[in-house]
C-alpha cells in the first residue's frame, strides 16, 4: 500500500541535514544512515549513502532512476546462500 498523497514523501530530518551539510562543502563523503524508510529525493542525486542492512553499512550511489523509492529497497537484509545441493554419493545408495 502506498503512502497518502496528502501526507507527502518522508525522509528523516537527520539525513536531510547531512545532505545539506555535504552540499555546502566541496568534498563529498559517504553518508552513513540507519534510515531505510527514507524516500530518496532529487537533492540526493550524486551522493553515496551507506545504508545499514542489519550487519554492515552498504554503500549505495544515488542516481536519478532511484528518486521516489525508499533507501531500504536497494540494500537487501537477507543473504540467500542457495538451496541444499544434492549429494551424488547419497543418491546412488
Swiss-Prot record:
Record function comment: Protein S19 forms a complex with S13 that binds strongly to the 16S ribosomal RNA.
UniProt keyword Ribosomal protein present: yes
GO MF term list: rRNA binding; structural constituent of ribosome
Keywords, ordered alphabetically: Ribonucleoprotein, Ribosomal protein, RNA-binding, rRNA-binding
Membrane-crossing segments per the record: none
GO biological process: ribosomal small subunit assembly; translation
Entry's family note: Belongs to the universal ribosomal protein uS19 family.
Database matches in Pfam families: Ribosomal_S19 (PF00203)
Protein name: Small ribosomal subunit protein uS19
Species classification: Bacteria, Bacillati, Bacillota, Bacilli, Lactobacillales
GO CC annotation: cytoplasm; small ribosomal subunit
Gene3D superfamilies: 30s Ribosomal Protein S19, Chain A (3.30.860.10)
Domain of life: Bacteria
HAMAP family reported for this sequence: Ribosomal_uS19
